[in-house]
């Protein structure tokens, strides 16, 4: 990789395993993990309206600027259009649950349409799915 991060967007409902997977991916492949909850807390913006969610999307997209190596974005990213706009090199849909504990997020979340990997069950073997996807170019 040269002068630019390889961005992996882990999208899915709250509780689908995004954070756990991001931590495992960083441990195996290196890079950085950017957690949407931590970004929201740093901004002290707890508005979950459509406008608040869009602001969070913009913060998450900006969080990759200036980074190198693998960057794992751990983010619900509820709207298909936003997932496309993120500019991620790899989109992983964590489709492990159908309903989260947050009714407002359930309503806002659009089932992923464009993705590179779809994870439907969470197990240790799933890490091998990334072996041919996360290759550092010299």
Give a label for each model feature.
Residues 1-4, 8, 24, 28, ...:
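NTP-dependent small-molecule kinase module
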Residues 5-9, 32, 70-72:
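Residue-level preference for the first positions of well-ordered beta-strands
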Residues 14:
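The conserved Walker
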Residues 18:
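Conserved lysine of the Walker
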Residues 22-65:
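Conserved substrate/cofactor phosphate-moiety recognition/catalytic segment
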Residues 37, 94-95, 120-123:
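Residues at the C-termini of beta-strands that transition into short coil/loop
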Residues 43-44, 99-109, 128-130:
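Short, charged, surface-exposed secondary-structure boundary motifs
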Residues 49-102:
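Glycine-rich phosphate-binding loop used to anchor ATP phosphates in small-molecule kinases
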């Amino acid at each position: 990789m040269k002068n630019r991060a390889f961005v992996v967007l882990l999208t899915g409902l709250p509780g689908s395993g995004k954070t756990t997977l991001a931590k495992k991916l960083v441990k195996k492949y290196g890079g950085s993990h950017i957690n949407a909850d931590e970004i929201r807390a740093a901004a002290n913006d707890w508005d979950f309206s459509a406008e608040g969610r869009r602001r969070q999307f913009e913060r998450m997209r900006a969080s990759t600027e200036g980074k190198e190596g693998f960057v794992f974005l751990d983010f619900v990213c509820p709207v298909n259009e936003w997932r496309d706009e993120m500019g991620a090199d790899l989109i992983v849909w964590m489709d492990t649950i159908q309903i989260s504990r947050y009714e407002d997020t359930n309503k806002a979340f659009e089932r992923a349409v464009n993705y590179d990997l779809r994870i439907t069950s969470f197990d240790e073997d799933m890490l091998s799915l990334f072996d041919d996807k996360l290759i550092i170019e010299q």
